[in-house]
C-alpha cells in the first residue's frame, strides 16, 4: 500500500452542496459524480449527498452507473450522460438507469427496447445549443417537434443542454445558448429542463430552470474565471458564435450593443471548501554540496550546500511531470520548492531553509490541501482543477472523513 494518504472530507462536499442549494432557490440540485466522483470516490460522495436530500446523480457511462446503483437504493435517479447503445441497453433497464439521449439513433435504440420489454422507459433528451459536442442538433429537434411518435413508449422527464463558457460570466455565448434553449423548450411546454452546471448556477436564476447539475463546485473547484470583454455584445457575438448568429437569437438578446454584466448571487458571502488533502512522508534525506545535480537529465543544479528530501509519489500517481522544477509543497504551512524532474514514483524537494526540527524521515508533507488547492496546482502547470483531481492515482491510501 502507498505511503501517501489521500483524505476526502465529505463534510466539505456536503457544505458545498448546501451552498449551491441556497443559491438555486427555484431548482433542485443534482450532482455530477462521473469519473469516480472527479477521482475522489463516487459512491462515498453520493451516499453523503443523499443525506442532504440529493436525488439526482450524473455519470458518464453505463458502467459507472451500474457501479453506483449497486451502492445506492433503487429510488435514487442515476443519469447516464453518454446515453444508450445497443450493447448496454438491457443493463440500463436492469439497473434502473436513465439515459440522456443525444441523437435520433439513441432515441431509436431506447424506443426499440421499450417495445421489446413492453414497458415505458424513462429518458432525458440533450439538445445541442452551441457546445457542439453532444446533443440533438437543430434538424433532429425539428424532427421530434414534427413527429412526436419518435418518442412513443418513452417517458421524457427532462430536456437538458450544456453551457460552453459558463465560467466566463460576461461571455455573450451564455446568453445566446440560454435563448436558444428557451426557444426549443417552447415546443415541449410540459417537460422539465436543466441547463446549469457549476458555472451556470452562478450566472443567475434564469439559468437554473428545474434542475442544476454541478460538478466542479461540489469538489471545491473554482467554476468561474475573470474575463474582460471590451467588444460590444454584437461584435463579440458575431465574431465568436457564428453557429448561433441568427437574427432570431440576436434580437432576443435585448440591446445588441449593450455589454453584458452578470451578478453573482450574494457574491463574496459564500466560500466553497476544498475537500481534498494529499499527504506524503519524507522517505529519504541527503546532504548535497554546491553544484550537485538532481534527478533525471540533471535539470536542477544546487546553488549552495543543500538538504534534499524525497517523497514517494510521481507521475504514476497523477502528480504531473510538468511540476518538474516548479511548484511547491508544504511542511507545517511552510512552502518548500520541488526540484529536479518528477519521476514515475518519486519527487525531490529542497528543505534546506526549514528549521532542523522539521526535517526528519517520516515528516508529513502536504501536496494538496488548503495551502495548495487543486485550482492553484492547476494554474502552475496550465490545466484545470478538474484534471488535477481526476488524475489522482489508485495507489493512494484513501481516507474519508465525515
Curated annotation (Swiss-Prot):
EC number(s) given by UniProt: 5.1.1.1
Q: Entry's CDD domains?
A: PLPDE_III_AR (cd00430)
The protein's UniProt keywords, in alphabetical order, are: Isomerase, Pyridoxal phosphate
Reaction catalyzed: L-alanine = D-alanine
Name the top EC class.
Answer: isomerase
From the record, give the transmembrane residue ranges. Answer: none
Q: Where is the active site?
A: 34 (proton acceptor), 296 (proton acceptor)
Give the source's domain of life in one word: Bacteria
Alphabetical list of InterPro entries matching this protein: Ala_racemase (IPR000821), Ala_racemase/Decarboxylase_C (IPR009006), Ala_racemase_C (IPR011079), Ala_racemase_N (IPR001608), Ala_racemase_pyridoxalP-BS (IPR020622), PLP-binding_barrel (IPR029066), RPE1 (IPR005728)
Q: Which GO terms describe its biological process?
A: D-alanine biosynthetic process
Q: Where does substrate bind?
A: 133, 344
Cofactor dependency? pyridoxal 5'-phosphate
Pathway assigned in UniProt: Amino-acid biosynthesis; D-alanine biosynthesis; D-alanine from L-alanine: step 1/1
| Location of N6-(pyridoxal phosphate)lysine modifications | 34
One annotated Gene Ontology cellular component of this protein: cytosol
Q: Name one GO molecular function term.
A: pyridoxal phosphate binding
Q: Where is the RPE1 insert domain?
A: 226-271
Give the SMART domains listed for this entry.
Answer: Ala_racemase_C
Query: What HAMAP family does the annotation carry?
Result: Ala_racemase
Please give the function described in this protein's UniProt entry: Catalyzes the interconversion of L-alanine and D-alanine. May also act on other amino acids.
What family, per the record? Belongs to the alanine racemase family.
The name on file for this protein is Alanine racemase
Species whose genome carries this gene: Rickettsia typhi (strain ATCC VR-144 / Wilmington)
Amino acid at each position: 500500500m502507498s505511503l501517501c494518504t489521500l483524505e476526502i472530507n465529505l463534510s466539505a462536499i456536503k457544505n458545498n452542496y448546501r451552498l449551491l442549494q441556497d443559491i438555486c432557490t427555484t431548482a433542485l440540485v443534482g450532482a455530477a459524480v462521473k469519473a469516480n466522483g472527479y477521482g475522489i470516490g463516487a459512491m462515498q460522495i453520493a451516499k453523503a449527498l443523499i443525506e442532504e436530500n440529493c436525488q439526482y446523480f450524473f455519470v458518464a457511462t453505463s458502467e459507472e452507473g451500474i457501479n453506483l446503483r449497486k451502492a445506492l437504493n433503487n429510488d435514487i435517479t442515476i443519469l447516464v450522460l453518454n446515453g444508450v447503445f445497443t450493447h448496454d441497453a438491457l443493463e440500463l433497464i436492469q439497473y434502473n438507469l436513465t439515459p440522456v439521449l443525444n441523437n435520433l439513433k439513441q432515441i431509436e435504440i431506447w424506443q426499440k427496447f421499450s417495445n421489446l420489454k413492453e414497458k415505458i422507459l424513462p429518458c432525458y433528451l440533450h439538445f445541442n445549443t452551441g457546445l457542439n459536442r453532444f446533443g440533438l442538433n437543430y434538424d433532429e429537434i425539428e424532427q421530434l417537434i414534427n413527429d412526436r411518435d419518435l418518442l412513443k413508449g418513452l417517458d421524457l422527464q427532462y430536456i437538458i443542454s450544456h453551457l460552453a463558457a459558463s465560467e466566463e460570466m460576461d461571455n455573450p455565448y451564455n446568453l445566446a445558448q440560454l435563448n436558444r434553449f428557451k426557444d426549443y423548450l417552447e415546443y415541449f411546454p410540459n417537460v422539465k429542463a436543466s441547463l446549469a452546471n457549476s458555472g451556470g448556477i452562478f450566472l443567475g436564476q434564469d439559468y437554473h430552470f428545474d434542475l442544476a447539475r454541478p460538478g466542479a463546485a461540489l469538489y471545491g473547484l473554482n467554476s468561474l474565471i475573470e474575463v474582460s470583454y471590451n467588444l460590444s455584445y454584437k461584435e463579440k457575438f458575431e465574431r465568436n458564435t457564428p453557429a448561433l448568429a441568427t437574427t432570431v437569437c440576436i434580437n432576443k438578446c435585448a440591446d445588441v450593443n449593450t455589454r453584458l454584466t452578470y451578478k453573482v448571487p450574494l457574491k463574496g458571502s459564500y466560500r466553497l471548501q476544498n475537500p481534498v488533502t494529499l499527504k506524503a512522508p519524507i522517505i529519504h534525506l541527503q546532504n548535497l554540496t554546491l553544484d550537485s545535480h538532481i534527478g533525471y537529465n540533471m535539470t536542477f543544479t544546487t546553488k549552495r550546500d543543500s538538504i534534499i528530501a524525497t517523497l514517494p509519489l510521481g507521475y504514476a500517481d497523477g502528480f504531473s511531470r510538468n511540476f518538474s522544477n516548479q511548484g511547491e509543497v508544504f511542511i507545517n504551512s511552510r512552502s518548500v520548492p520541488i526540484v529536479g524532474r518528477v519521476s514515475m514514483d518519486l519527487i525531490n524537494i529542497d528543505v534546506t531553509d526549514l528549521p532542523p526540527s522539521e526535517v526528519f524521515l517520516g515528516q508529513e508533507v502536504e501536496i494538496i490541501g488548503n495551502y495548495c488547492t487543486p485550482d492553484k496546482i492547476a494554474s502552475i502547470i496550465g490545466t484545470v482543477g478538474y484534471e488535477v483531481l481526476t488524475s489522482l492515482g489508485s495507489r493512494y491510501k484513501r481516507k474519508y472523513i465525515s
